[in-house]
């Protein structure tokens, strides 16, 4: 199949985003709905018939294409974006002028976590920077934060480059002894955390310095790790919430509109939870399709991994109810151990096929400072 794939046309990705933007600007729900079929067609063509030319790039790009498709389902089809408002917005969205709607749509499209909107889940996000903080104070602080994430990412990447379990022809992550499995699981998490945090912090510095956005629009992308004493709090409060809007709105649609289940019931809560984790699994599984292609059914583990997370949360919830558990200091310490052990057990089975396919080729930066200091070679390491 790979010999018949065409180069991924960047123009189609732009066209998909243009359709989403037009839909967000438009006052007409009918017009928005008419935009979804071309978004679906363009997305399916890219996913099924094209490639970036590098499987370790395809896995990321295919997940992004799927995310845009689901965002299209949210904006164009299952919800009315006119119901959304910015914080402090008094004029109904459909009554804004064309120029105001264009700016409003730009804010919506660039805010996957709904930062600055009334539907932002502020109770689960880190605090916003203070609105009265001077711009250059924010820029200096975020610049130091960005440097910190760069150092962490560079060190983690050097360790990954030197570790056989992350290489295409390396040792299986599931076959190493448990102490090393603990270490490699922590390294993988540290890479994702530092990589996304670095990019996010760097973007905040640039965009605030240019006056494109305000400093209080940049709450940290990851939450406080002290909340990771349950699987539920890890996914809901610690890990990034970039997909929160699209997984929750589709969960709402399936649970409360399609199945019409009453809110607050055991069945409705779990249908919503499993739907949300299923959607997250789909995003990552389609990414795996871009990497594995004909071997996707044998190697993909995303759906299994994310549905296991929903199951773990269900078990936590019911055990907590039965034994009336409260987050005492002792139970929190035990909870941190439980959370880490859970990921040591479940994560390697999902990630190992990806590492054998070259997933770590994309990790870090082309030139590594720590690798150069360690090996005396200032060279490309990815």
UniProtKB/Swiss-Prot annotation:
GO terms for cellular component: membrane. InterPro entries: Wax_synthase, Wax_synthase_dom. Keywords: Acyltransferase, Membrane, Transferase, Transmembrane, Transmembrane helix. It is an enzyme of class 2 (transferase). Its EC number is 2.3.1.-. It comes from the Eukaryota. The chain crosses the membrane at residues 5-25, 33-53, 59-79, 146-166, 192-212, 335-355. One of its GO terms (molecular function) is O-acyltransferase activity. It holds the Pfam family MBOAT_2. The keyword Lyase does not apply. Pathway: Secondary metabolite biosynthesis. Its main location: membrane. It catalyses: cyathatriol + acetyl-CoA = 11-O-acetylcyathatriol + CoA; cyathin A3 + acetyl-CoA = 11-O-acetylcyathin A3 + CoA. Belongs to the wax synthase family. Acetyltransferase; part of the gene cluster that mediates the biosynthesis of erinacines, cyathane-xylosides that show unique biological activities, including leishmanicidal activity, stimulating activity for nerve growth-factor synthesis, and agonistic activity toward the kappa opioid receptor. Within the pathway, eriL converts cyathatriol into 11-O-acetyl-cyathatriol. EriL is also able to acetylate cyathin A3 to produce 11-O-acetylcyathin A3. This is Acetyltransferase eriL. It comes from Hericium erinaceus.
């Amino acid at each position: 199949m790979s010999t018949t794939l065409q180069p991924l046309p960047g123009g189609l990705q732009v066209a998909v985003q243009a359709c989403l933007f037009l839909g967000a600007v438009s006052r007409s729900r009918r017009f928005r709905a008419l935009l979804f079929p071309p978004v679906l067609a363009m997305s399916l063509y890219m996913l099924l018939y094209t490639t970036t030319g590098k499987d370790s790039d395809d896995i990321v790009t295919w997940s992004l294409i799927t995310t845009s498709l689901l965002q299209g389902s949210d904006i164009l089809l299952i919800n009315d974006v006119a119901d959304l408002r910015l914080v402090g917005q008094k004029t109904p969205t459909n009554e804004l002028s064309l120029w105001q709607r264009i700016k409003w749509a730009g804010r919506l499209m660039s805010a996957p976590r709904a930062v600055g909107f009334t539907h932002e889940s502020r109770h689960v996000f880190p605090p916003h920077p203070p609105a009265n903080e001077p711009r250059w104070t924010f820029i200096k602080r975020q610049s130091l934060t960005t440097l910190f994430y760069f150092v962490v990412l560079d060190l983690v990447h050097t360790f990954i480059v030197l570790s056989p379990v992350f290489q295409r022809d390396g040792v299986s992550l599931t076959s190493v002894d448990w102490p090393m499995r603990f270490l490699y699981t922590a390294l993988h998490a540290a890479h994702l955390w530092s990589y996304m945090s670095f990019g996010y912090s760097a973007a905040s510095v640039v965009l605030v310095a240019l006056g494109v956005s305000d400093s209080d629009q940049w709450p940290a992308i990851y939450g406080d790790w002290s909340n990771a004493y349950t699987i539920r709090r890890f996914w809901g409060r610690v890990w990034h919430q970039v997909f929160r809007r699209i997984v929750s709105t589709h969960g709402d649609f399936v649970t409360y509109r399609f199945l019409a289940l009453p809110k607050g019931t055991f069945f409705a809560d779990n249908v919503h939870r499993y739907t949300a984790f299923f959607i997250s699994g789909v995003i990552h599984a389609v990414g795996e399709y871009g990497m594995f292609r004909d071997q996707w059914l044998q190697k993909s583990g995303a759906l299994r991994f994310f549905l296991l997370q929903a199951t773990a949360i269900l078990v936590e919830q019911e055990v907590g109810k039965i034994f009336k558990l409260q987050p005492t200091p002792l139970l929190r310490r035990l909870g941190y151990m439980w959370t880490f052990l859970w990921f040591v057990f479940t994560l390697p089975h999902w990630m190992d096929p990806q590492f054998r396919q070259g997933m770590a080729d994309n990790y870090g930066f082309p030139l590594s400072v720590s690798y150069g200091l360690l090996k005396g070679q200032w060279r490309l390491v990815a």
